[in-house]
């Protein structure tokens, strides 16, 4: 069960013999979790909680060498998904391509930073399987962003997405939300869509490499601490059992990003299976 594998480190002072299981409760706290990836290979997720910035970063490498970075930024209500995809030069592709998808954060997706920073793992060598397999979140990214004319990009997005020259996307509804809330996120200059996209096919159904189409990019996070678990303490003086936070529930979650590309050959990863 979860209680034998994970605990929330208490900020109280403990006797010295307990401290071997604690990482210092400083600004940054890192957790490495071994997971089974969707292709069956064993991978390692690195989860990094930054209490000062109030964000959590999850990084892992897929079996094909793609490097995935997902940032959950609670302060700005932003989720950034970045994929660094290795190309196949023998097929005329670049050495690598960067995709960046910036959308509004769902606060029920992952536990808050303060609890993530206190999470400890007792058996780091074990391969983890999430307790709950959540479905796929389907995001239609209807706004492409011109990186070189993006105005003010706050540092985190700039650092992650500056190489996503032909693959930086967001959603109109999300930019409106950030604007309405006065959140300093991004000043976007959307790329013009010169084609009526209503009748476009998906890229796998498009035969001509130079035709525009809708591309999809899929990924799954195999292990996320998605909920806090509560236990009942012993009854106090008033005879009441008070609940306290004693661990986490883990989830896996999929994402599918759909977006317009002017040429099918800009979408080599979306093939019919």
Walk through the language-model features, giving the residues of each.
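A generic alpha-helix propensity feature with a strong bias for hydrophobic helices
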Residues: 14, 127, 193-195
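Generic alpha-helical propensity signal that fires on short helical segments
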Residues: 76, 88-92, 97, 118-123, ...
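Short linear motifs in intrinsically disordered/low-complexity regions
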Residues: 3-7, 18-19, 74, 107-110, ...
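An acidic-aromatic
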Residues: 58-118
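Signal-peptide-cleavage-adjacent N-terminal segments of secreted and extracellular proteins
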Residues: 1, 6-66
């Amino acid at each position: 069960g979860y209680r034998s594998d994970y605990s929330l480190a208490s900020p109280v002072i403990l006797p010295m013999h307990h401290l071997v299981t604690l990482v210092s409760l400083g600004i940054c706290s890192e957790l490495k979790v071994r997971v089974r990836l969707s292709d069956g290979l064993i991978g390692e997720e690195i989860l990094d909680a930054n209490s000062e910035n109030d964000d959590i970063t999850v990084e892992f490498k897929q079996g094909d060498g793609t490097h995935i970075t997902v940032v959950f930024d609670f302060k700005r209500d932003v989720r950034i998904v970045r994929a660094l995809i290795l190309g196949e030069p023998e097929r005329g592709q670049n050495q690598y391509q960067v995709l960046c998808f910036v959308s509004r954060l769902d606060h029920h997706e992952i536990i808050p930073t303060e609890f993530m920073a206190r999470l400890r793992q007792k058996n780091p060598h074990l391969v983890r399987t999430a307790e709950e397999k959540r479905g796929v979140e389907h995001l239609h990214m209807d706004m492409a962003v011109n990186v070189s004319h993006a105005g003010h990009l706050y540092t985190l997005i700039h650092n992650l997405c500056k190489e996503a020259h032909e693959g930086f996307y967001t959603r109109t509804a999300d930019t409106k939300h950030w604007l309405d809330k006065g959140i300093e996120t991004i000043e976007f200059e959307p790329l013009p869509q010169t084609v009526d996209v209503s009748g476009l096919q998906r890229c796998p159904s498009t035969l001509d490499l130079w035709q525009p189409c809708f591309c999809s990019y899929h990924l799954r996070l195999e292990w996320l601490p998605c909920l806090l678990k509560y236990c009942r303490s012993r009854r106090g003086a008033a005879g009441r059992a008070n609940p306290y936070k004693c661990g986490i529930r883990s989830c896996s979650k999929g994402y599918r990003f759909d977006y317009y590309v002017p040429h099918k050959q800009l979408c080599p990863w979306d093939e019919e299976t």
